[in-house]
Amino acid sequence: MTLLPTCETRVLLTSHMKRFFILISTAWLLSPIFLFAGNHPGTDRISLNNNCPPGFEQVAGKCYLRNLYQLYPSLQDAGVGGLKTGLPALREGFTPRQIDLGRYLFFDPFLSGDGSLSCGSCHHPDFGFSDGMDRSIGITGDKVKRSSPSLWNVAFLDDLFWDARAASLEEQSKGPLFSPDEMGNTEDRLVSDLNGNQTYIRLFNEAFGSQAITAPLVYTALAAFQSTLISLNSRYDQYAHGYHAALTQTEIEGFNIFRSFVARCAECHTPPLFTNREIAIIGTPEPAGLPFDEGEGGWTGEPTQRGGFKVPALRNIALTAPYMHSGRFDNLKDAVGFYTKGRGHAVPESENLSIHWHIWEPDLSDHEVDLIVSFLETLSDESLEPAIPERVPSGLNPVGRMPARNTN
């Protein structure tokens, strides 16, 4: 049974929706369409945006998210899988210039040790801010240990990385930047290189009022940009806000299975973010020839956390194949089908994992798995996707080397 909103709620939602779409339209109209590079030979001057990204409102010079979910109660009040669910707190309150500076840094290969990779190489908009690989390819040309997680809605997450080892977006930035097998840079070299670029010196001064570029300012700018990667306007969201024609009957059936006590998907992938932001041990298999990945237990040393990984958000999940921390499953049907095969069925005999209590054997039919997949495809929404800069301050090609999409 679907509960319709009261007249008072309808009026409030209508008013808020008008304001929401005005915010989006105004931000796009005021945003510069072409942003060119600065002091590098052959480029024009780059300027930072003075307006918040679409979906954000500027208050006292800082950007704050405005979304219909903010009108709803907490996740706990709405129940698991409920439609009228609220949002947890998020990182926000950055200035438009800090956000835009972060965008240039994110897509500039200048941040890597040899100028070949940017953050956007492994977190590309075309792949749902992942990279389409089972495991990402780093600066050495070799695959790294895990797949590249999507960055959509990371502003809502308390812990980052598959194994939850970073407690903030700023801390998370250091991992790929300075990992020898990812972007291969060092903090000293990064700061030195940026301070040797007159365009970056000017942009950091405009964004932070600082005459010198420091590492913490780099991390803050990257965090500011990533905090605006919001995806909450899919067809599912339209359905959740009361427009029931947004989903087909097949997709609604898939959603009902998804949140049912039998499948229990929504126990961990809780709307509206479709993650409970916790660690789960589910015992997914590693690719052939690879050792067992200890996950969270690898850095905590806690035996009960071995094989534990962050519950990924399912927003834009149709764009981010392959799936799981190692990219073990090529498609959504295989990923969903994994859960139907029995508790701990893929755990190596040498491991005694504390499998999450939600994991059991729902014994779903192929048709029911297909219905869940059809629902998951309704979570696609790139309406607030930021533009890749036409030019970046280094003069290098934006984004950098992109590996071919494959799982070999």
Predicted features and spans:
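Positively charged n-region of N-terminal signal peptides that target proteins for export
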Residues: S15-R19
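C-terminal capping alpha-helices of c-type cytochrome domains
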Residues: E187-L232, A318, R328-N408
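Bacterial N-terminal signal peptides
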Residues: I24-P32
